UniProtKB/Swiss-Prot annotation:
The keyword Hydrolase applies. Belongs to the agmatine deiminase family. The active site is at C356 (amidino-cysteine intermediate). Keywords: Hydrolase. Gene3D superfamilies: L-arginine/glycine Amidinotransferase, Chain A. One of its GO terms (biological process) is putrescine biosynthetic process. It is an enzyme of class 3 (hydrolase). This is Putative agmatine deiminase 1. InterPro entries: Agmatine_deiminase (IPR017754), Peptidyl-Arg-deiminase_porph (IPR007466). It holds the Pfam family PAD_porph. The keyword Hydrolase applies.
Length: 363
């Protein structure tokens, strides 16, 4: 693996849409007892279910720490590759590389700096040095050269692209004090355009209500295909989420993408508010410097946090009446894909969902 002193734009590489073909998918095995309840055992079962669902559509690699390797290997099917890799937590969407491709089919990784969603300002845990090495290690495993941006903080869950020059993100996240306070909005745009080969960036204001990642876009918005997008929605005007989703809808409805297309926006209603129970709260170890999980806290639940695989869509189930409505809507949006629901409350309790725990490798 080479570290290349250049940029995607200079070298003719672009970030493809997630709906384009994949060579495979990465997942990190959860274990932090101060984030995942009951020693991460319930979460591990949910991660197995996600990995298994995706493995029916494309190759899956699960990376696990040395102390969890044997356990992960035992719990996962033989079709899933398990590799030992140090990590601080299980959010490979954010700590892993953002892959870019060229017209010849070559793939490279963009290795952003990772600081646990806000560093010493409002990061979620410390230290995060193992997570900051995950992208490089995955590039090594995949034998892909990389671009390394040691001075630019970004998480993969904070961006979505259409593969044709347009990126969508949120001001709440990318302009937050804990990311790149030394850079202006225009300077941040310049970096993204240079390393992902973009022509236009659409800025939403905020992400899902109470999203602890400072409003990652992948929990509120997704690209179905170029020009067609999905948005988390609620019809309950008394819910704080309504104002946020309405604001996003208004922005998207009045924007055009890099190709000059008006966006076709499809709403997918979120479940009813999901709160942490007393039992769930007590199952998480209390550690200074880590975000606590308190009884009654509202979780940032959204069906938009799904993963698009080769011929499949893997989406979260919450035990809510809207589960089936979300399935129907996703099947309409992806008529040529098999839509698979996976029970995801245990992942949600850790602070994210299916899209957050996955990272695709394009081909």
């Amino acid at each position: 693996m080479r570290t290349i002193d250049s940029s995607s734009k200079k070298d003719g590489f672009r970030m493809p849409g997630e709906f384009e073909k994949h060579a495979g998918c990465y997942i990190i095995w959860p274990e932090r007892p101060d984030n995942w309840r009951l020693g991460a055992k319930p979460a591990q079962k949910a991660f197995v279910d996600v990995a298994t669902a995706i493995s029916h559509f494309e190759p899956v690699t699960v990376v696990a720490s040395s102390s969890q390797y044997v356990n992960a290997r035992y719990m996962l099917s033989d079709e899933i590759r398990v590799v030992e890799m140090d990590n601080d937590d299980a959010w490979v969407r954010d700590s892993g590389p953002t892959f870019v491709v060229n017209d010849s089919g070559d793939v490279r990784g963009v290795d952003w700096s990772f600081n646990s969603w806000g560093g010493l300002v409002d990061g979620l845990y410390f230290p995060w040095d193992k997570d900051d090495q995950v992208a490089q290690k995955i590039c090594e495993l995949e034998r892909k050269d990389r671009y390394r941006l040691a001075d630019f903080v970004l998480e993969g869950g904070s961006i979505h692209v259409d593969g044709e020059g347009t990126l969508v993100t949120t001001e709440e996240c990318l302009l937050s004090e804990g990311r790149n306070p030394q850079l202006s909005k225009q300077q941040i745009e310049m970096v993204l355009k240079e390393y992902l080969n973009l022509e236009k960036i659409i800025w939403l204001k905020r992400g899902i209500y109470l999203d602890e990642t400072n409003g990652h876009v992948d929990n509120i918005f997704n690209y179905v295909r170029p020009g067609v997008v999905a948005l988390a929605w609620t019809d309950d005007e008394t819910d704080p989420q309504y104002e946020i989703s309405k604001e996003c809808f208004d922005i998207l409805s009045n924007e055009t993408d890099a190709k000059g297309r008006k966006l076709e926006v499809h709403k997918i209603n979120v479940p009813k508010p999901i709160l942490i129970t007393d039992e769930e709260s007590k199952g998480v170890d209390a550690v200074e410097g880590t975000l606590p999980r308190e009884e009654g806290d509202r979780l940032a639940a959204s069906y938009i946090n799904y993963y698009t695989a080769n011929g499949g869509v893997i989406f979260p189930l919450f035990g809510d009446p809207n589960d089936e409505l979300a399935r129907e809507k996703l099947q309409q949006l992806y008529p040529n894909c098999e839509v698979v629901g996976v029970k995801a409350r245990e992942i949600l309790l850790g602070g994210g969902n299916i899209h957050c725990i996955t990272q695709q490798v394009p081909r």
